[in-house]
Amino acid sequence: MIQDILKEAQDHMQKAIEVLKKEFATMRVGRATPALLEKVVVEYYGTQMPVNQLATISAPEPRLLVIQPWDKGALGAIEKAILKSDLGITPTNDGSVIRLAIPPLTQERRQELVKVARKKAEEARVAIRNIRRDANDRIKDLEKDKVISEDEGKRGQDEVQKLTDKFIKTVDELLKAKEDEILSI
């Protein structure tokens, strides 16, 4: 019983880490990566589609992204979607591809990005703590229903706490790496 609860809690905590990694990957840090455009959604023939489903995205240079749509008719829609996004990058359309020159970050923008990264890390920590609370509640319910002994319940809660500490530490490490990346460019 407790092992099932622990396994489920671990899976959920791992998902929270994966979400944080994705969030960090889409943050613009002055280096061109196709992941920057993951959240950009294009209105194409009346449907909302991610850019990566309409085009090939490559980074031929550290500060340049090239978007090559499979259908040239999508160029305008992709350009409009990038302009509407919160990336703060102006696309250049040459009729066959869209180029995104990634400008170097100002010190102010770096500080903003660090704040955003910290906020996202805190959201991940809160999610992990909520998972801990749910797991502990389930263990207490088993204890209350006399399915497990008090000692087993205590051991189970200790295991949940160890899991929580491990995943919170991972969040802190990811945040530290992201802050270093943002501030070092």
Curated annotation (Swiss-Prot):
The keyword Disulfide bond does not apply. GO terms for cellular component: cytoplasm. One of its GO terms (molecular function) is ribosomal large subunit binding. Pfam families: RRF. Keywords: Cytoplasm, Protein biosynthesis. GO terms for biological process: translational termination. Gene3D superfamilies: 3.30.1360.40, Ribosome-recycling factor. It is found in: Cytoplasm. CDD domains: RRF. Belongs to the RRF family. Responsible for the release of ribosomes from messenger RNA at the termination of protein biosynthesis. May increase the efficiency of translation by recycling ribosomes from one round of translation to another. This is Ribosome-recycling factor. It comes from Carboxydothermus hydrogenoformans (strain ATCC BAA-161 / DSM 6008 / Z-2901). The lineage of its organism: Bacteria, Bacillati, Bacillota, Clostridia, Thermoanaerobacterales. The gene is frr.
